[in-house]
Amino acid sequence: HINQFIEENNFAAVFTISASILPLPDLSRTGYEEIIKRTDFSLTVAKQHGRNCCYIFQEEEYQNFLRIREITNELHSAVNHDFRGFSIIFQPVMDIRQDKLTGAEVLIRFASKKFGPISPAEFIPLLETSGLIIPTGRWFMREAITACRKIRMQIPDFRVNINVSQVQITKSDVITDLISE
């Protein structure tokens, strides 16, 4: 651990160091700009790990960081362009005693332009951390309720189950939104 307490002119400070180790690849293939980006990433991760920490650059972690950043950018773009890339699907709910369809769980899906279908386990946390879950959740509920109304013309007792994020509950008027739909 590197940590130094300095007191001078009635001013006290403790200094710590966060460092990273970045193996330098062949510059002719990588280029200086990419090395600067990887260095910035490495130092950011070292600081996130806490004081007096050294992070050794891992290519796999960097590629995952780039993937997350790209998916997050695509999510922003989709929300700003009428939710292009999002879709809803229905998971049937059956009453097996009567062998009857009683409803469906409505699920949200997202297809990335670059990566194809993205797992909800990956994109929903990104929606939550970016705050995009609020407008996306509103869109999703509108779509689910509209679809349910159409299905009810054929199956009057049809019901839908909608999953709601904790972020939607704590940071939006999700109940009011549902009632207004």
Name what the model sees in each region.
Residues 1-11, 38-40, 140-150:
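Alpha-helical scaffold within the catalytic cores of cyclic-nucleotide enzymes
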Residues 2-19, 47, 116, 152-158:
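Catalytic core regions of nucleotide second-messenger enzymes
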Residues 5, 46, 78, 147-151, ...:
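Hydrophobic helix-cap positions at the C-terminus of alpha-helices
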Residues 10-11, 16-35, 60-64, 92-98, ...:
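Catalytic strand-loop-helix junctions within cyclic-nucleotide turnover domains
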Residues 16, 23, 27, 98-105, ...:
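Catalytic core of bacterial c-di-GMP phosphodiesterases, primarily the EAL and HD-GYP domains
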Residues 18-27, 34-49, 55-70, 74, ...:
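Cyclic nucleotide signaling catalytic output domains
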Residues 51-52, 84:
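Flexible, glycine-biased helix-capping/connector loops in cytosolic signal-transduction modules
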Residues 67-126, 163:
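Active-site core of bacterial EAL-family cyclic-dinucleotide phosphodiesterase domains
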